[in-house]
A protein has these predicted regions:
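Aromatic-lined, polymer-binding surfaces characteristic
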Residues: 87-268, 275-278
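N-terminal leader/propeptide and maturation segments of large enzyme subunits in energy/redox metabolism
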Residues: 269-291
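Extreme N-terminal leader/anchor segments
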Residues: 1-79
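Phosphate/oxyanion-binding loops and surfaces in catalytic or ligand/nucleic-acid-binding neighborhoods
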Residues: 26, 30, 251, 277-281
């Protein structure tokens, strides 16, 4: 009875669209994704990105990963992508591929890690194929592909996998969760649509941009704070919008000036809010919520 009351109490705060998508997700079979693996993937020409915000080098070895203060090492081409003995959030981080920006690692080892992920993680595998995880991985792969400092030319197998991930994400947007997850989904579709060429890519781009513009107005409140009122989520969303502006401003004509102006204004407000809440040592307040 207590579980039922808790469940109903949670549902009462959801929007109708969230409830509908939640029911759809639970009752309907997963949508099938069709990609012609024999056809070469086409890229939009001349796409550029300025260097993104990157963490300090981790100091990890090429096949060593450290998340949540827990470090694991693997042999080359023998990464355990399941890691059942590790916490779920640790496993998620393994699949995010944030470490592609780690200057401690060699380009060759990163290339092997990407190929190993593709060979090991079929569509639908738990942890690897969840919308939030896929969203972060799409953006991280594209950033890496466009980063001249790694001197890595994307292989067709990588591009086909990236295209498949974007097609899968389009069918699995987190309408039932919204908030920062929804924004991550939109950002990934926007990046994939800007990176690839063709009708699918154009649809991803338009869909992602539409959601981003809507969510910039909804999630960044009048005072510049994020609507979840969490300093951590606020920082994550600020970085998302900085990445989005990076892509917009480095690729003339990609996005309409009025949309860029709106995104800049909302991002500027969010940066001002972040500046105002920082502690004297420059760290964010360690609260789950500011409310």
């Amino acid at each position: 009875m207590n579980s039922l009351k808790l469940y109903l109490s949670t549902l009462r705060y959801l929007r109708l669209r969230q409830l509908l998508y939640l029911v759809k997700q639970r009752l309907l079979p997963a949508p099938r994704i069709k990609i012609d693996r024999a056809q070469a993937v086409q890229l939009r020409q001349g796409v550029l990105l300025s260097p993104s915000l990157v963490p300090d080098p981790s100091g990890c070895e090429d096949y060593e990963f450290s998340f949540l203060n827990v470090k694991r090492s693997f042999a080359a081409k023998r990464i355990n992508w399941v890691c059942a003995d590790m916490p779920k959030l640790w496993r998620y981080n393994l699949h995010y591929f944030d470490y592609l920006n780690d200057r401690s690692r060699s380009s060759d080892s990163l290339a092997e890690i990407v190929s190993d992920w593709i060979d090991t993680n079929a569509v639908g595998v738990e942890d690897a194929w969840e919308p939030y995880t896929v969203s972060l991985r799409i953006v991280n792969w594209i950033k890496w592909f466009l980063d001249d400092s790694f001197d890595t030319i994307p292989r067709q197998e990588w591009l086909r996998s990236l295209c498949l991930q974007a097609a899968w994400l389009e069918k699995n947007i987190e309408h039932h969760l919204l908030a920062n997850h929804y924004l991550k989904n939109a950002k990934a579709l926007f990046f994939a649509g800007a990176y690839f060429a063709g009708s699918d890519a154009e649809r991803w781009f338009r869909k992602g941009l539409k959601i981003l513009c809507e969510e910039a107005c909804e999630q960044i409140l009048a005072d510049g704070g994020h609507n979840e009122r969490s300093p951590m989520y606020h920082c994550i969303v600020v970085e998302d919008f900085l990445d989005i502006l990076n892509l917009c401003l480095n690729n003339s004509g990609l996005v309409e000036p009025r949309e860029i102006a709106m995104l800049r204004e909302r991002t500027s407000a969010a940066l001002d809010f972040l500046h105002d809440i920082l502690a004297p040592d420059g760290q964010i307040p360690l609260f789950l919520s500011l409310i």
